[in-house]
Amino acid sequence: MASRAGPRAAGTDGSDFQHRERVAMHYQMSVTLKYEIKKLIYVHLVIWLLLVAKMSVGHLRLLSHDQVAMPYQWEYPYLLSVVPSLLGLLSFPRNNISYLVLSMISMGLFSIAPLIYGSMEMFPAAQQLYRHGKAYRFLFGFSAVSVMYLVLVLAVQVHAWQLYYSKKLLDSWFTSTQEKKRK
């Protein structure tokens, strides 16, 4: 920016940024972690909706059992896994620590525990498929145990990352709370 009188006016050459305030690191981290958790929640909702669709088709007998198998037992309690995701979303607007803690605890109960049970429930069928090449449940021509193990592995990864980011977000919120109490 040049002035009519001659050289550039003082402070307009871009060297005046050092006195400006910066956003605290825990606020930047909070925004980033909220965004990552929201992405994971949306991926979880897609998995959840696919599971609901599969269960609905199986129970309502819209297709024959040769195409869509009846649901495994672990799929019923996993339907409650949408509750931790909703609690997590509710905790974001006002940085509500208690909702985030409830979300993390209920994620273990409603998301991780059914997935662990599901891996144990489907293991004999997977073992039989691996050893003898026989499958008794099918999803559109594919072995149901293979497809459901893929879904299970994806869901475990989504929930593990969601727990990891939630813990980091909780630490970030505690940092900002402790700084406010010191002042």
Swiss-Prot record:
Modified residues (Phosphoserine): S3
Entry's transmembrane regions: 40-60, 72-92, 97-117, 138-158
Topological domain spans for side Cytoplasmic: 1-39, 93-96, 159-183
Source taxon at top rank: Eukaryota
A GO cellular-component term linked to this record: endoplasmic reticulum
Lumenal side: 61-71, 118-137
UniProt keywords, alphabetically: Endoplasmic reticulum, Immunity, Membrane, Phosphoprotein, Protein transport, Transmembrane, Transmembrane helix, Transport
Subcellular location, record wording: Endoplasmic reticulum membrane
Membrane topology label: Multi-pass membrane protein
Protein family membership: Belongs to the jagunal family.
Function: Endoplasmic reticulum transmembrane protein involved in vesicle-mediated transport, which is required for neutrophil function. Required for vesicle-mediated transport; it is however unclear whether it is involved in early secretory pathway or intracellular protein transport.
PANTHER family reported for this sequence: PROTEIN JAGUNAL HOMOLOG 1
Protein name: Protein jagunal homolog 1
Annotated source species: Bos taurus
